[in-house]
Amino acid sequence: MEDMALVIEGRLRARARRSAAAGSLLAMEVAQAGLLIATTLADAGIVLTAGNGGSATQCEHLVSEVVGRFRSDRPGMRAIALTAGSATTTAIGNDYGFDQVFSHQVRALGRPGDLVVLFTTSGNSVNLLEAAHAARSVEMNILGIVAGDGGRLGQECDNLIRVGAGSTAAIQEDHLTVLHLLCEVVESELLGIALGPIEVDGVVTIDEAIDCRRGWAAQGVQVAWTNGCFDLLHQGHLATLKYARGSADALIVGLNTDSSVRRLKGDGRPIVPEAERAELLASLSSV
């Protein structure tokens, strides 16, 4: 059991590093795609989604959030997962071939200005390429949620969201994060709901910490606070931080400046400079 737990912990850390490596380009692609979805819905258009296997579940997940709700009660918006109807997909697959299961539906349901969202881990599925060609023929916009360069599908899309290449499971986990972020952008644009929930990790300024605290309070998040010099980090510090983190939903740790530590502890302190103390604290799992 312990060996298995260690392996799982390693996997979780690898996933965290993968998420941390996502840069500003991915963020910009998500923002642009979210605005495209919002514009389509605002113009009374419809969003169609398609994908295979695990990506099919992403399609239905996105549609459930759009038609139902993501964060707040609101009227439903128009979206259809082309993967959802087993009778339809098997009928088309039987009569026209599996390569046409999505394209046939795109031509039937899509109109100029509508949007088709194609989820794929490889970018090379023939039925998704055919769906893109069908969308082009009826003057729909095409958004690909892909990995790496997007494969062959990447060349057929008007917009791309490109997560890092990796295992199928890792890509699908990234796609899940992406679809939730897309829903945030859509609701923010169409309903004026602030992007959130607020997620902060690492070193922030006092003003940023105050803004986070206000945002968390509005969301009903309980926040703990502790502070200190943390010049020579020891077991007592770790126990205090662990206790503080366990007492609330989030923890903010205040850190004395170098000049403050010097006034409190003498000219020979701090031993560890402020920036390094901050990074050390931020690396702890309890903070």
Enumerate the language-model features and the residues they cover.
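Generic N-terminal amphipathic, Lys/Arg-enriched alpha-helix
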Residues: 1-25, 196
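Short, glycine-rich nucleotide/cofactor-binding loops
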Residues: 20-27, 115-125, 226-237
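A short, well-structured juxtamembrane/interface segment
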Residues: 25-43, 204-216
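Alpha-helical segments flanking ligand/cofactor-binding loops in enzyme cores
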Residues: 38, 64, 129-133, 242, ...
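Anion (oxyanion) recognition and catalysis
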Residues: 41-42, 136, 154, 217, ...
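Glycine/serine-rich anion-binding loops at beta->alpha junctions
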Residues: 45-63, 228-243
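Glycine-rich phosphate-binding loops that contact phosphosugars or nucleotide phosphates
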Residues: 47, 55, 60-191
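Nucleotidyltransferase catalytic core that binds NTPs
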Residues: 196-287
